[in-house]
């Protein structure tokens, strides 16, 4: 399973934040999808 992404912090660039939210979305989708 993917590990939970870490927030890049208050000094993060927009690109870093975009990558973080992309990774977070994929992580949440993975852990919440049915396991059938």
From Swiss-Prot:
One of its GO terms (molecular function) is neuropeptide Y receptor binding. GO terms for cellular component: extracellular space. Pfam families: Hormone_3. One of its GO terms (biological process) is neuropeptide signaling pathway. PROSITE patterns: PANCREATIC_HORMONE_1 (PS00265), PANCREATIC_HORMONE_2 (PS50276). Keywords: Amidation, Hormone, Secreted. InterPro entries: Pancreatic_hormone-like (IPR001955), Pancreatic_hormone-like_CS (IPR020392). The modification Phenylalanine amide is found at residue 36. It is found in: Secreted. Belongs to the NPY family. Hormone secreted by pancreatic cells that acts as a regulator of pancreatic and gastrointestinal functions. This is Pancreatic polypeptide. It comes from Aquarana catesbeiana (American bullfrog). The lineage of its organism: Eukaryota, Metazoa, Chordata, Craniata, Vertebrata.
């Amino acid at each position: 399973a993917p590990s939970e992404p870490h927030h890049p912090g208050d000094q993060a660039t927009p690109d870093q934040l975009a990558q973080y939210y992309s990774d977070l979305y994929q992580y949440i989708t993975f852990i919440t999808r049915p396991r059938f």
